[in-house]
Amino acid sequence: MPEMEKKDDARIVIISSIGAITPMPKSSIYAAAKSAIHSYGESLSRELRKKSITVTVSLPGYVKTKAHERAGLNHLKDKVPWWMWINAKQVVTETEKASIKGKAEIIPGKVYKLVRPFLNFNSAIRVWRKITRRN
């Protein structure tokens, strides 16, 4: 941190997940871990604000990577609608722009920005449960 404190535009980016801010039945450990990362980022952001270090937490939704495959979640490719997937480049681009602007949080992807206010509704949780259910 001492080296970062010497700079005028020091930035830290932390990647969490949209799962940090919504209940995720059957994925409670994942949601809890992402919530902890999100909370850590928010706390760090407030701690370092006085030192002119910007901390941005990114909360992406479903990102097209091989991570789902490696985690044994291949069924998500077929069950999650195409419009809910975003590519990694979009996550990086939107997160970088938010960091440069000094934002503490970014939710990459228009669809996730639109649905965020509804993520804690029971209907949204039921839809998520149906989409992610294994056959």
Which role fits each region the language model picked out?
Residues 1-6, 45-46:
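Amphipathic alpha-helical dimer-interface segment in Rossmann-like NAD(P)H-dependent oxidoreductases
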Residues 13, 55-58, 68:
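Hydrophobic structural elements of the Rossmann-like NAD(P)H-binding subdomain
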Residues 17:
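Residue(s) in the substrate-gating loop at a strand-loop-helix junction
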Residues 24-28:
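Active-site loop immediately N-terminal to the catalytic Tyr-X3-Lys motif
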Residues 33:
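Active-site helix of classical SDR
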Residues 36-48, 58:
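Hydrophobic alpha-helix immediately C-terminal to the catalytic Tyr-X-X-X-Lys motif of short-chain
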Residues 57, 78-114:
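C-terminal helical subdomain
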Residues 60-70, 74:
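Short, flexible catalytic-loop segment of classical short-chain dehydrogenase/reductase
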